[in-house]
Amino acid sequence: MFVLSGYEYFLGFLIVSSLVPILALTASKLLRPKGGGPERKTTYESGMEPIGGAWIQFNIRYYMFALVFVVFDVETVFLYPWAVAFNQLGLLAFVEALIFIAILVIALVYAWRKGALEWS
């Protein structure tokens, strides 16, 4: 009988999780269509010929809104499992979550005071 300890399972998972993307990328490279003409290298704009240059500058405020969104989206990802297991975690986990939320509220107030949330 062959018995695996915890490290062999980890090693097997590491090998499989490394081989799957490598095999998928290799298969896609081998099976993709080769060549193509100049039509393949043009940008796609709703089936119409592109007009003008593609290098336009976006307002920096788009990036600020996106950054604030990502911060609070990550907050949700961290707080959801905590809320699901709230009854089993105890007081220490509650205090840690409050500290985490307080840091994010301070970051929100800082972004608000700096004008990152205003569009003018």
Curated annotation (Swiss-Prot):
The chain crosses the membrane at residues 2-22, 64-84, 89-109. InterPro entries: NAD(P)H_OxRDtase_bac/plastid, NADH_UbQ/plastoQ_OxRdtase_su3, NDAH_ubi_oxred_su3_sf. It is found in: Cellular thylakoid membrane. NDH-1 shuttles electrons from an unknown electron donor, via FMN and iron-sulfur (Fe-S) centers, to quinones in the respiratory and/or the photosynthetic chain. The immediate electron acceptor for the enzyme in this species is believed to be plastoquinone. Couples the redox reaction to proton translocation, and thus conserves the redox energy in a proton gradient. Cyanobacterial NDH-1 also plays a role in inorganic carbon-concentration. This is NAD(P)H-quinone oxidoreductase subunit 3. Keywords: Membrane, NAD, NADP, Plastoquinone, Quinone, Thylakoid, Translocase, Transmembrane, Transmembrane helix, Transport. GO terms for cellular component: NADH dehydrogenase complex; plasma membrane-derived thylakoid membrane.
